[in-house]
A protein has these predicted regions:
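Conserved C-lobe activation region of Hanks-type protein kinase-like domains
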Residues: 216, 221-228, 235-289
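Structural motif in protein kinase domains
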Residues: 123-133
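Activation segment/activation loop of eukaryotic-type protein kinase catalytic domains
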Residues: 170, 175-206
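ATP-binding glycine-rich loop module of kinase domains
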Residues: 36-88
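Catalytic-loop of the protein kinase fold
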Residues: 157-174
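Juxta-kinase regulatory segment immediately upstream of eukaryotic protein kinase catalytic domains
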Residues: 1-28
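Activation segment signature within eukaryotic-like protein kinase domains
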Residues: 146-147
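Short beta-strand micro-motifs within the conserved protein kinase catalytic domain, predominantly
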Residues: 97-117
Length: 353
């Protein structure tokens, strides 16, 4: 038996009426859900996803010597933040996010710390990694449609003062033919208190934009966080089509001594080299999608969204308009247009045959 109560909910009917019917095994290379244990739960003939907060993980990250009561407080605060942020987004008419539908706390006896806060979400069909086929052109329309959904979701969050910060393939959830953003746990909200608000970046560092890797931070909260989301959206486009993130492409083209894990200079000093690596990464991406219809349009979006310097990131027309650099409306329209063009091409090709 695991000493953590969060790992031992299987078979239990919780006080809120949810019966925990299956434990979800974390994938070997997964980088998410560090602080939680995931289950499938059912209630009233409805099957949902349950996220249990794991005290042992909070204790592990807090280090030795920290009072147990303080660690419990941190865990409870993280639980309340994600729950309340979900409510905040729903009130702001956000639709492209997987929301909390129930929550509670369970106490299990015979454990050193028996309290287990949990959140219940609508059950997705899976994350986007299970759906993508990197060599199937017929899947191209679906990819554009999914990216369109995600761009809408990011814009909706921005409209209510929220930055997702952790946009990556495992956090894109598939519901039938609709894609939604998952896991707001690391998001930042301008109007809500969170431990992450003191950070420059709160997402997965494997996907972080280059300015964060080189420890450069814009002072303005909106510029810093929204620029990050723009980069992550562009990186997601790269992943959808090549199966690799933009950060991995950038790293591939940076000389060893200039990579962020070795660099000891300033962001200003590394800019010329970063720009060269970016140009090479874009070229590789463009070559990699040469077989795709509309590849030039797609590459242009990635160029703009993933530009290595945040002040020049975004659509050129938006950059010229003060305060609108990171407005995603043009990209939402573009993705919708590209999807329709791709659908039309498939229709015409079928008619020819």
């Amino acid at each position: 038996m695991d000493i953590s109560a969060a790992h031992n909910l299987l078979g239990i009917t919780l006080q809120t009426g949810w019966k925990v019917i299956r434990k979800i095994t974390k994938e070997k290379n997964s980088t998410g859900a560090f602080f939680s244990v995931c289950y499938i739960a059912s209630k009233d003939e409805r099957t949902c996803f349950l996220k249990a907060f794991d005290f042992a993980k909070f204790q592990q990250i807090s280090g030795e010597g920290k009072p147990v009561i303080d660690i419990i407080s941190e865990m409870t605060k993280a639980f309340k933040y994600e729950r309340d942020l979900s409510v905040h987004c729903q009130k702001g008419y956000v639709t492209k996010v997987a929301f909390v539908i129930d929550s509670g706390e369970e106490f299990l006896k015979d454990y050193p710390i028996g309290i287990v806060p949990y959140l219940v979400f609508e059950l997705a069909d899976g994350d986007v990694r299970s759906r993508l086929q990197f060599s199937n052109y017929l899947d191209f329309v679906w990819k554009l449609s999914s990216l369109h959904d995600i761009a809408i979701g990011i814009k909706q969050l921005h409209n209510v003062g929220v930055s997702h910060q952790d946009l990556k393939p495992s956090n894109v959830l598939i519901f039938r033919d609709e894609s939604k953003l998952g896991d707001l746990g690391r998001s930042m909200c301008k109007s809500m208190d969170s431990e992450y608000n003191s950070l420059d970046y709160s997402g997965d560092w494997n996907y972080a934009p280059p300015e964060m890797m080189y420890q450069y931070s814009e002072v303005d909260w909106y510029k810093r966080t929204f620029a990050t989301d723009c980069y992550l959206l562009g990186s997601l486009i790269v992943f959808y089509l090549l199966g690799i993130s933009m950060s991995a492409l950038l790293l591939k083209h940076m000389p060893q001594n200039l990579r962020w894990e070795h660099w000891r200079g300033t962001f200003e000093e590394v800019r010329p080299y970063l720009l060269m690596a970016y140009s090479q990464a874009i070229k590789e991406f463009h070559n990699g999608i040469s077989g795709y219809y509309l590849n030039d349009d797609i590459c242009m979006m990635v160029e703009q969204l993933c530009y290595p310097f945040p002040e020049h990131r975004g659509h050129p027309r938006n950059i010229q308009s003060k305060g609108r650099n990171y407005n995603l409306e043009r990209y939402i329209s573009k993705l919708d247009l590209l999807k329709r063009k791709a659908e039309l091409k498939i229709f015409k090709d079928c008619c020819k045959n």
